[in-house]
A protein has these predicted regions:
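Intrinsic, low-complexity polybasic segments
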Residues: 6-7
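Generic structural detector for well-ordered beta-strands
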Residues: 30-34, 86, 134
Length: 161
């Protein structure tokens, strides 16, 4: 599997801003657990999973042409306002893991992502999580998510799950 997700073809749906979305299919990102990411028990340290979520989210968006640095240069910021993780089994040093990322919901000002971390060769879920992001201006005030961002994220005009 290609770690960058290149070649993964996903349909981009064109829509306007709406109250919710049906979940789009997962985008997979593969990476190998580095030694520095583990604790004394040889498990991935719990807070590292939030970094993995960020990697998955950035690659999800990059695959759709919505690169974070480009958005930020246009004054579009997606601040994390909530993050959760449920740990089911540990990943260890040198394990190859898959970060599965998708959007579960979009509102006028917020985007909700879901994540699953699995071994790269299995569907056994090690960690599942979510993040909620508020779209803000450079000054920190809330703003509507621009339509071009909604389009790039590939959401469909359906009710929230």
């Amino acid at each position: 599997m290609n770690p960058s997700g290149a070649g993964l073809s996903l349909c981009i749906a064109f829509s306007s801003i709406f109250a919710g979305v049906a979940p789009v299919e997962y985008h997979d990102t593969i990476l190998r657990v580095r030694y520095a990411e583990t604790d004394r028990m040889d498990f991935v340290y719990y807070s590292r999973y939030f970094e993995y979520f960020e990697v998955g989210r950035a690659e999800y968006m990059r695959a759709r042409g919505a690169v974070y640095s480009d958005l930020e240069s246009e004054g579009i910021k997606l601040a994390v306002v909530e993050a959760t993780a449920r740990y089911k089994a540990p990943a260890k040093y040198d394990d190859e893991i898959r970060i599965r990322t998708r959007i579960s919901r979009v509102t006028k000002t917020r985007v909700f992502f879901e994540y699953e971390i699995t071994p790269s060769d299995s569907d056994r879920v090690l960690v599942e999580g979510s993040t909620e992001h508020a779209c803000i201006h450079d000054n920190g005030r809330p703003r509507r998510i621009p339509e071009k961002v909604i389009k790039a994220l590939g959401v469909t005009e359906k009710k929230e799950i």
